[in-house]
Amino acid sequence: MKIQLIAVGTKMPKWVEEGFKEYKRRFPHDMPLELIEITAGKRGKNADIARILQKEGEAMLAAVPKGNRIITLDIPGKKWDTPQLAEQLESWKLDGRDVSILIGGPEGLAPACKAAADQSWSLSALTLPHPLVRVIMAESLYRAWSVTANHPYHRE
């Protein structure tokens, strides 16, 4: 099973790129983690945010390979602790499809992305900086994998 993070935003700080790459490197070969960056719409004082969200959503959905399970990151989504995320990861593997996780921009996700989702996941009730979410996602998914593989990374 392949996991894709499809995220709005490019040109992240070096520490974000390095943090993501560190966890990506740790994933097993049979479960690669990939990051696809979507260019954010130009936001200005008089920007049409609804139109920007629509365009970003179209680009995100176009990046999802046909047949993939789509999971959105959204505050009202399901909240999973590490053991629950590990159970989800196992469930996704048994489903036999690759997984695309959509991470919206500053205003969140387009309605079309939410409508296309098989599941919605709430990483936190907190508002998190979008660059940091990439690193948190990579670490959380790696930790969940480590639980399923009885790897010593996760300790309770």
Curated annotation (Swiss-Prot):
Q: Which Gene3D superfamilies match?
A: 3.40.1280.10
Any single Gene Ontology cellular-component annotation: cytoplasm
Q: Which chain positions lie within coiled-coil regions?
A: none
Provide the binding site for S-adenosyl-L-methionine: L73, G104, L123, S124, A125, L126, T127, L128
Q: What is its main location?
A: cytoplasm
Q: Which GO terms describe its molecular function?
A: rRNA (pseudouridine-N3-)-methyltransferase activity
Which keywords label this protein?
Cytoplasm, Methyltransferase, rRNA processing, S-adenosyl-L-methionine, Transferase
Report the catalytic activity: pseudouridine(1915) in 23S rRNA + S-adenosyl-L-methionine = N(3)-methylpseudouridine(1915) in 23S rRNA + S-adenosyl-L-homocysteine + H(+)
State which Enzyme Commission number(s) the record gives.
2.1.1.177
User: Where is it localised?
Assistant: Cytoplasm
Q: Does the keyword Methyltransferase apply?
A: yes
Please give the family membership noted in the entry.
Answer: Belongs to the RNA methyltransferase RlmH family.
This protein's assembly is summarised as: Homodimer.
| NCBIfam families noted in UniProt | PRK00103.1-1 (NF000984), PRK00103.1-4 (NF000986), tRNA_RlmH_YbeA (TIGR00246)
What's this protein's function?
Specifically methylates the pseudouridine at position 1915 (m3Psi1915) in 23S rRNA.
Q: What is this protein called?
A: Ribosomal RNA large subunit methyltransferase H
Source organism phylogeny: Bacteria, Pseudomonadati, Pseudomonadota, Gammaproteobacteria, Vibrionales
* Gene for this chain: rlmH
